[in-house]
Each structure stands twice: as structure tokens, then as C-alpha cells.
Amino acid sequence: MSPLLFGAGLVVLNLVTSARSQKTEPLSGSGDQPLFRGADRYDFAIMIPPGGTECFWQFAHQTGYFYFSYEVQRTVGMSHDRHVAATAHNPQGFLIDTSQGVRGQINFSTQETGFYQLCLSNQHNHFGSVQVYLNFGVFYEGPETDHKQKERKQLNDTLDAIEDGTQKVQNNIFHMWRYYNFARMRKMADFFLIQSNYNYVNWWSTAQSLVIILSGILQLYFLKRLFNVPTTTDTKKPRC
């Protein structure tokens, strides 16, 4: 019974290992069908703990344009260092580019198909967390496969002009969307900065008010003791 169980366990282990080792990138069904090219875009905010690192993987096809931008919105904790380090690696694990600062960008052309790694490190801040706003994705300028080029030859001049105009409008909309995200990142960073300054001014004003009131009470107490004249009686008289 035990040899059968051991053999079944090996079979299950092999199946799990083979399933985990498979690539999850899209595959084309046949040679006539073009490879799917999706323009995935992401924008969200994450909280990185003190000294921590957060990584993301984005799938991209060859001959694409990869963009990645970030901005530190606020800090939480004892330290207020807002600098972070960003890195981008290709599917083979080789470093493509780095960026350090409160905000930055990493843009490059994808030379191979696979998952590209993006990492953000809070290594400069060991006593506080940072909230970082991210905006990254892949954009493809237009059809570049042989299948699309053959289809373009079959279109007349009018449809070709309409397609070119539509592609230009799509590119302009995409770049305007990126500028809009830059404005959102800057707006949120300014909002958190104003809120932090507002809280700082309120706490500092309250502390100064308490110090002024306490110092007034102490001054009144010492002045009262200074002018306090002891009463004289028959049994208790001041000495010469």
C-alpha cells in the first residue's frame, strides 16, 4: 500500500511542478492569427514599510513602449525622508534602469516578450513608511505584424487615411492621459503636504499657547510670593 501511495505522490508532485514551471504569457493560436497586443495601464497607491521593498511584474510583448512613473505622496512614522529607489528588470532578470528621488520615471522600449519586473525600495527610511502613487503600463504605437501589414495593403486610400487619423488621435489621448496622471500625482502630493503643514501649525500653536499660559501662572505665583508680607503677632515678631 505504501509504495502505491508514494508513487501517486510523485505523480502529483510532478504535475504541480510542471504546472508551476509553465509560462503564463499569451500564445497565438496559429501562424495566421496575430499575437495579442494589449495596452495594460495601471495607476494606484501603495504603502511601503520602513526599509521594505515592493515589486510588480508587467507582461509586455516585443516592440512595445514601457512607461513607469512614481511619486511619494506622504510619509508616516518618525522619519520624514521621502526618497525612494526604483528599478526595472527585463524578463531575463537584467537591470534596465534605475531612478531615485521623491518622484521619477523609467521609460524604455521592450526588446523581448515576457514579464518585466518593477521594484520600489524604501531603503533610505528605516523609521517611517511612505505612500507612493504608481502609474505604469505598456503601449504599442500601432500594428507591426505581417498580418496587419497585409491587411493594410487591401484597404483603399480613404480607409487608410481614416485609420492613420484614428491612430494619431489614440496616441494623443494616451499621452494626455499620462499628463493627467502626472497632474493627479502632483495634486495628491501637494494635498498631503498642505494637510501635514496644517496639522503641524495647529499642534505648534497649541503647544505655544499652553507654554504661555503655564509661564503666566508661574510668574503670578512667584510675584505673589515675592510680595507676600508675613503677619506679625505678639508672640511672633520679626527680628531686628
UniProtKB/Swiss-Prot annotation:
All ranges on the Cytoplasmic side of the membrane: 224-240
Compartments it resides in: Endoplasmic reticulum membrane
Transmembrane feature ranges: 201-223
GO cellular component: COPII-coated ER to Golgi transport vesicle; endoplasmic reticulum; endoplasmic reticulum membrane; endoplasmic reticulum-Golgi intermediate compartment; Golgi apparatus
Glycosylation sites: 107, 156
Regions of this protein lying in the Lumenal compartment: 22-200
Annotated ranges, domain GOLD: 53-138
Signal peptide: 1-21
Pfam families: EMP24_GP25L
Membrane topology: Single-pass type I membrane protein
Main localization category: endoplasmic reticulum
Top-level taxon of the source organism: Eukaryota
Keywords: Endoplasmic reticulum, Glycoprotein, Membrane, Signal, Transmembrane, Transmembrane helix
Protein's GO biological process: endoplasmic reticulum to Golgi vesicle-mediated transport; Golgi organization; intracellular protein transport
Similarity section: Belongs to the EMP24/GP25L family.
PANTHER family on file: TRANSMEMBRANE EMP24 DOMAIN-CONTAINING PROTEIN
Name this polypeptide is given: Transmembrane emp24 domain-containing protein 6
